[in-house]
Amino acid sequence: MAAATEENMSVAALVMSVPDNIGRSPEVEGGGAAGEEKDAATKGTVAVGDSEEDGEDVFEVERILDMKCEGGKNLYKVRWKGYTSDDDTWEPEVHLEDCKEVLLEFRKKVAENKAKAVRKDIQKLSLNNDIFEADSDIDQQGDTKEDTSPRKKKKKIKYKEDKSPDDLRKKRAKMGKLKDKFKTELESTSEILGFDVKTKKRILEVKEELKDSKKPKKDEIKETKKTKRADIRDLKIKIREDVKDNRKTKKERYIDSPLESESPNDSFTLEDESEDFLSDNKEKQNVRTAKDKTGQDTVQESIFEKHLDDLISIEEAGTRVRRKKKQPRKFEEPKEIKKLENTNNFLERKMIPKKQRNQDKGRSNPELSKLPSPVFAQTMKSLRLSGEEKGLKSSDLAEEEKERKNEPKEKYQKRYDFDKEEKARKEPKGLKSFKEIRNAFDLFKKTAEEKNDLENNSKREEISLDYKITHDNKTKDKCSLREERNTRDETDTWAYIAAEGDQEVSDSVCQTDESSDGKQPILSLGMDLQLEWMKLEDFQKHLDGEDEPFITANRIPSNLLRDAVKNGDYIAVKVALNSNEEYNLDQEDSTGMTLVMLAAAGGQDDLLRLLITKGAKVNGRQKNGTTALIHAAEKNFLTTVAILLEAGAFVNVQQSNGETALMKACKRGNSDIVRLVIECGADCNILSKHQNSALYFAKQCNNVLVYELLKSHLETLSRVAEETIRDYFESRLALLEPVFPIACHRLCEGPDFSTDFNYMPPQNMPEGSGVLLFIFHANFLGKDVIARLCGPCSVQAVVLNDKFQLPVFLDSHFVYSFSPVAGPNKLFIRLTEAPFAKVKLLIGAYRVQLQ
């Protein structure tokens, strides 16, 4: 009878532990132990409804201190009347159904705190670890909280013993339904009380909680640590002793009274104890099943002991990690309380006879450990929580160590961390030493770590404070770019065109850089220029390459000079070119790339000016015919194109595929480069290898502005040429049609001009008609073109299909007789050499009629 009573009371303790597996009052925690002592004293005299526990044990809720969300459920921290802060427990909302007024009062206070926080100014969140303490215990806030909340009673739930295993199954099903119902109710309440992490209210709420919360004193922290360690040790010893005692009692129970091992129907009721025993055969079978059951129990007890040892070792490891911290986390205490509760529940689960698992005899031994026991599930959950807690502690330690290291550098890094980050994304313009590159990499790495710290400290926020700082830095960069454009407008006419037309190109050429002393971000024009103190005269000297010389005793080899030009290191190039060393500035690599081409392809305007002033040639050609101007036009560098054109770069040079700089600019759709090249005398009618003109590439890029610009320029050239012919012949010559499109040739690009064209003669040639070749001197003044059939240029020979053509007038070499044949024709013109002449020649042939 005594054994049966103990078994039934332990079953009742298991059922009572089911709804309290999340958070339990201190009286409920001690209920199981008190019940066992009572059973030992009464020895079977307890009847249903006659014991003292049949009365209602009343616990009054004094107030609700805090709320948190764990596992999708809202838990409330409850202060019980007559108990200290050490006895506070986390209770689900379901346990507070009789205390709705207290719950509503707590929610009202939360809403009032929100309203107060909205009125305050928004300040930056501190990057320390105090953010993690926002949802910690508020044990020290007793004087700030009001005690005016009404006191309600929480009744202890009384569980009656089941009459049969069928009733137990029904009760389990009901409990499962209740759990589902509780989950839905908790989800609905969490949706109502959930904070919007995408708004600034959450930030303000965290600040308010940070201000209201107080850190526990060091003495109290030490005392709580000592008590926790002592509790863990006592619990471990108690568990092992209970397991040993349980083994002994079971063995004695099955050896001394094997007939007392009843069937599963007899294990759950007190009334069935008076029934007759089974037959002798059934008794023998029960003895065998009892022995088998003891064997299974011993196996499971060993698994259980290992399970508990692992759990306690994890807790001890957690306490070791906690010793290293300066300030312990408050929110970790509820988790440790839960671990103690879970171990107690596990112990109660172990003390219960395994008769419930005999109900399903078809299950194997591993399946027995997977029974729908809420205690076992809660224990597994506590293991997961302890693992997560351990990870949190290790991450917190790393964060604290990093903060201690970064404290003296925070002020310096706050101003420049985002500038460094943006600078690292862009292609570096200057050749830096190894130490500078390493420092920049370290600083970039630190800024990335700081971003991770911000994300870890504000997990509930999606609004990042980094956005504001980066936005401010971007506005500063834009302002500095405007100042730089204004300076260049006053000094360089070509750069004025660049800043007026193409902002994107100027942004890529003139990037913001940071000074080496770290005081103020300054502009970088391919070198370390400090424009805040540089005057206009000094800047003009810099543009002309006449600024202060740099002298060094060390010789810089040619390969390092080439690397410096490629990387945009102005100082290194300046030092090398001002030294006594003689360099071949027109040196080429395996592809024919010169230093000027490298500077032009990289958009290094300062290096390009420096090389040009030192005598580098701008019209070098690679093996495929590419020039520095073609590189600059292809890379869309407007100011670089302007510098090269001013230095005398050839505009009509063709690559091996027949493309020119004008075609490259049309491909990129840059109307400013197209206008600049056209005004310098680019030929719009040159055909590529695939018989495509610049007008074709303008159509391909779908840029209407570029297409209209080319079309209007060609129409202007044709109109000016026809008007010049009529004025020259005084309307005695009628122009019928052009033989080939009008061409443009710059005399400085060479004395030879050649072109190919197809001619289709008309079927009926009227009398007095023929074909004449005209060579005009032209000047381009913006959109205006002035042409004349005279000038200093001397035409030496005109050859058409290997036949010399004769001039019409003996005293003029600008009008020639022209006899093309049907089909393809090849024209060659030899002019006098004038490498420095800026005159442009328009060449066209017309079928004319004498009047």
UniProtKB/Swiss-Prot annotation:
Localization per record: Nucleus; Chromosome
GO CC terms in record: cytoplasm; heterochromatin; nucleosome; nucleus
Site (Interaction with histone H3K9me3): F59
Keyword annotations from UniProtKB, A to Z: ANK repeat, Chromosome, Nucleus, Phosphoprotein, Repeat, Transcription, Transcription regulation
Domain Chromo: 59-118
Superkingdom, natural source: Eukaryota
Modification Phosphothreonine, positions: T144, T379, T447
Disulphide bonds in the chain: none
Biased composition (Basic and acidic residues): 159-169, 279-295, 329-364, 401-428
Post-translational modification Phosphoserine, affected residues: S51, S85, S136, S149, S164, S188, S263, S267, S274, S313, S386, S394
SUPFAM superfamilies (UniProt xref): Ankyrin repeat (SSF48403), Chromo domain-like (SSF54160)
Gene Ontology molecular-function annotations: chromatin binding; histone H3K9me2/3 reader activity; histone reader activity; methylated histone binding
Annotated segments matching region Histone H3K9me3 binding: 80-87
Entry PTM: Phosphorylated in M (mitotic) phase. Phosphorylation by CDK1 promotes dissociation from chromatin.
GO biological process: constitutive heterochromatin formation; negative regulation of gene expression via chromosomal CpG island methylation; negative regulation of gene expression, epigenetic; transposable element silencing by heterochromatin formation
Database matches in PANTHER family: M-PHASE PHOSPHOPROTEIN 8 (PTHR24166:SF47), ROLLING PEBBLES, ISOFORM B (PTHR24166)
Recorded domain comment: The chromo domain mediates interaction with methylated 'Lys-9' of histone H3 (H3K9me), with the highest affinity for the trimethylated form (H3K9me3).
Functional summary from the UniProt entry: Heterochromatin component that specifically recognizes and binds methylated 'Lys-9' of histone H3 (H3K9me) and promotes recruitment of proteins that mediate epigenetic repression. Mediates recruitment of the HUSH complex to H3K9me3 sites: the HUSH complex is recruited to genomic loci rich in H3K9me3 and is required to maintain transcriptional silencing by promoting recruitment of SETDB1, a histone methyltransferase that mediates further deposition of H3K9me3, as well as MORC2.
Quaternary data: Homodimer. Interacts (via chromo domain) with histone H3K9me3. Has the highest affinity for H3K9me3, and lesser affinity for H3K9me2 and H3K9me1. Component of the HUSH complex; at least composed of TASOR, PPHLN1 and MPHOSPH8. Interacts with DNMT3, EHMT1 and SETDB1. Interacts with MORC2; the interaction associateS MORC2 with the HUSH complex which recruits MORC2 to heterochromatic loci. Interacts with ZNF638; leading to recruitment of the HUSH complex to unintegrated retroviral DNA. Interacts with TASOR.
Protein name according to UniProt: M-phase phosphoprotein 8
Provenance organism: Rattus norvegicus (Rat)
Gene: Mphosph8
